[in-house]
């Protein structure tokens, strides 16, 4: 028998606050901090149009939430505190027999080395792109989306907000409106640009945009902008189709873009500018993955590190 839905709601959070205050004897400041973490997660679910039923929230949901926080430049220390708050909340839910599962149980703390979501290899990304069925009405659109996310390192909000007038075709640049309405120019490679215009000058012409969306690049079948959740589902479907078991989201292509550039020797400041990071310290996190690549290379190929 299916469980009765139990949604994360202001009323449930109020009961949780009472539990913290009365059962655990926490101070008002501590109670406020713990409830803030749960409210932040609830806001994320609302923005992404994800069900707030605690029995449908999975580890993947939590992982994608932290990928979202990372993309907002929320540091590892703050992420660790938020994760602690969510773990406390789910302990309360299980103690109250509101759920039998805890999606936070196996998620490591960012302070223990969890700074980034999974990164896809170039081969995995190419495999996903090659598997897209171009005979379907959405095929060329989805292919162009993956190309632009990986080829330009865009946030999902920047992808779905991209306008045709923001594409400088002759110069090979995109004008991106990022966080805080800050503008930046991001180069786009010839192959990605070609695939993008195959969609714009092909499949997109068969969709009649609604009045407010005539300049929007990526449209749904109703002629309006895609939502974050639609992009997430497209990415998830492609990953499953290709047997990719890594926990990924649209943000993964942005992280892969940055990591592959730095692994190839790109200038850190140039990558910072392309990503639209306010501080280079945020971009520097990606160098940890490059360090791991160097260590793997050393242990695999250097005679002093080979196993005898």
Named regions from a protein language model:
Residues 1-308:
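Conserved catalytic core of the tyrosine transesterase superfamily
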């Amino acid at each position: 028998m299916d469980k009765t839905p139990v949604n994360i709601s202001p009323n449930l959070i109020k009961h949780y606050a009472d539990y913290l205050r009365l059962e655990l004897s926490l101070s008002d400041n501590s109670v406020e901090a713990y409830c803030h973490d749960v409210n932040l997660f609830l806001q994320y679910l609302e923005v992404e149009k994800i069900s707030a039923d605690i029995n449908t929230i999975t580890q993947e949901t939590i992982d994608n939430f932290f990928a979202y926080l990372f993309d907002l430049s929320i540091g590892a220390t703050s992420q660790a505190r938020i994760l602690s708050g969510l773990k406390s909340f789910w302990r309360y839910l299980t103690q109250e027999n509101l759920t039998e599962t805890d999606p936070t149980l196996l998620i490591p703390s960012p302070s223990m080395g969890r700074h980034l979501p999974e990164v896809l290899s170039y081969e995995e990304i190419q495999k996903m792109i090659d598997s897209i069925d171009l005979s379907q009405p959405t095929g060329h659109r989805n292919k162009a989306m993956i190309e632009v996310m990986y080829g330009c390192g865009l946030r999902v909000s920047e992808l779905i907000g991209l306008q045709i007038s923001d594409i400088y075709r002759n110069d090979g640049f995109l004008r991106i409106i990022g966080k805080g309405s800050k503008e930046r120019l991001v180069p786009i490679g010839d192959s990605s640009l070609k695939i993008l215009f195959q969609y714009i000058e092909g499949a997109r012409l068969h969709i009649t945009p609604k009045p407010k969306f005539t300049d929007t690049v990526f449209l749904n079948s109703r002629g309006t902008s895609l939502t974050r959740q639609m992009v997430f589902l497209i990415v998830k479907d492609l990953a499953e189709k290709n047997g990719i078991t890594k926990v990924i989201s649209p943000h993964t292509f942005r992280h892969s873009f940055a990591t592959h550039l730095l692994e190839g020797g790109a200038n850190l400041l140039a990558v910072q500018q392309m990503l639209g990071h306010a501080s280079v310290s945020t971009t520097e996190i990606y160098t940890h993955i490059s360090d791991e690549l160097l260590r793997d290379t050393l242990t695999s190929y250097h005679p002093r590190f080979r196993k005898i």
